[in-house]
Amino acid sequence: MIKLGCTLLALTLTACTTVAPPQGSERGSGSVVSDRVKQLTRAVQWRPVATIPIQFNTHHPQGMVKIGDFFYVTAVEIRTPTKRFPQLQGGYDRDTGEGQGHVFKFDDKGKLVSDLLIGEGSVYHPGGIDYDGRYIWVPVAEYRPNSRAIIYRVDPSTMKAQEVFRFADHVGGIVHNTDDDTLHGVTWGSRRFYRWTMDSQGRVTNADVAPESLRKINHSHYIDYQDCKYLGRREMLCSGLNNYQSKKDGPRFALGGFEVVDLTTNLPIHQVPVEQWTESGLPMTYNPFWVEPTAGGLRAYFMPEDEKSTLYVYEADIR
């Protein structure tokens, strides 16, 4: 279910009525995507079908959803890079740096339509995002692990953000489980999972619980999730990557892939590499992605590059 007809109660709480997602919505295709992703193997060939130059500075892109003919991408504009401490200070390995979070809306030609500034102070790093048929869910965190985050929902029709809750850890990606009306987050490097419950009025009921009591360990290690989408049936699809070295001082090899994760167990139920790279060697799953069904397979959108980005479109046939 999704939220509509919301009445503002406080800065971070809302009372909402619930209705079913509209027929034919992007969320409604999730089960088809799930079934087809589970048929992907290393033998399935992804073929490039389009490259769309993005006509504005994308800074450092993070998450993406596609709604109709428009794309919504989160990005972090780094103004002062973080600096590592010689040793931990207050539990942190680096300072906060300075920056600005963005939610970009652009069309299928790569032209910027809207730029929503998002975040607050040192909380300027948006992460992976999800669309539930009504709202885009956006986590914004400090640019360092074990920090803090603000969770927003954005109305794509107005490009206005509403704060939902705050949490005492770095939340780098979020999905809305509309079957159970719960939110699920991943942390820095996706090493931890969180599950937040909501009451009948859409208010998060366990945001003030100590993170140590809520977190679950991610037992999948071959990639770090960068962006995730809810598929329905208590499953989410995540994309990500990891870097590997055959020698300590040798070159690094970046491998990306997809994982379908069971949100009841927090365990992957299907894993597959995506063996596609940019000319510079970045895996396509480096950061934002979106997947949708085609007549006989899947279409995937990737935007791995910073600043001067290209939207890469691939298709795969599922036999």
Locate predicted features.
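A short helix->beta-strand "capping" segment at the edge of beta-propeller domains
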Residues: 31-57
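A short beta-strand motif characteristic of beta-propeller blades
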Residues: 47-54, 111-119, 160-165, 208-218, ...
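Beta-strand-rich domains and repeat architectures in extracellular enzymes and scaffolds
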Residues: 50-92, 125-127
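Repeated scaffold domains used in trafficking and secretory/extracellular systems
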Residues: 59-63, 121-128, 168-178, 220-229, ...
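Short coil/turn segments that connect the beta-strands within blades of beta-propeller domains
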Residues: 68-69, 133-134, 179-181, 233-235, ...
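Short, conserved, GDST-rich strand-edge loop motifs in beta-rich repeat architectures
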Residues: 74-98, 141-145, 240-255, 311-318
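Short loop/turn segments that connect beta-strands within beta-propeller blades
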Residues: 106-110, 154-159, 198-202, 263-266
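Loop/turn-rich, solvent-exposed surfaces of beta-rich toroidal or solenoidal domains
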Residues: 220-267
